[in-house]
Swiss-Prot record:
Alphabetically ordered keywords of this record: ATP synthesis, Cell inner membrane, Cell membrane, CF(0), Hydrogen ion transport, Ion transport, Membrane, Transmembrane, Transmembrane helix, Transport
Organism: Klebsiella pneumoniae (strain 342)
Lineage of the species this protein comes from: Bacteria, Pseudomonadati, Pseudomonadota, Gammaproteobacteria, Enterobacterales
Function: F(1)F(0) ATP synthase produces ATP from ADP in the presence of a proton or sodium gradient. F-type ATPases consist of two structural domains, F(1) containing the extramembraneous catalytic core and F(0) containing the membrane proton channel, linked together by a central stalk and a peripheral stalk. During catalysis, ATP synthesis in the catalytic domain of F(1) is coupled via a rotary mechanism of the central stalk subunits to proton translocation.
Coiled-coil positions: none
Keyword Nucleus: no
Protein's recorded name: ATP synthase subunit b
Amino acid sequence: MNMNATILGQAIAFVIFVWFCMKYVWPPLMAAIEKRQKEISDGLASAERAKKDLDLAQANATDQLKKAKAEAQVIIEQANKRRSQILDEAKAEAEQERTKIVAQAQAEIDAERKRAREELRKQVAILAVAGAEKIIERSVDEAANSDIVDKLVAEL
């Protein structure tokens, strides 16, 4: 193998070129690559945190929705109970009012019946007295007595 000055010059130039690249070109390239790797890593970590935050927010929203539905169900049940209670109270009040009205009407009917009986007794007594007077005034004729009694019965 013949080594001549050209090969030796090329080897020295190559070593100087490698040293120059290692000293001045390689460090900025490595710094840029490391910076880019760090940015990508931070971006991925940020995306992962954002995904976890989103999952947590969705879970919280789901929990709040469930709580709201449960509270709404409780409110609906309370409203239904209150409605039933109001209906029962209204029915009881209406029943009491009906009983009161029926009792008043029955009392009025009884009072009217009693008054009518008293009036009828007075009229019967007056008619009996009038009939007795007529019987006494007339002769004791059987046909006349029977006629007067028939008239009295018809008037009663």
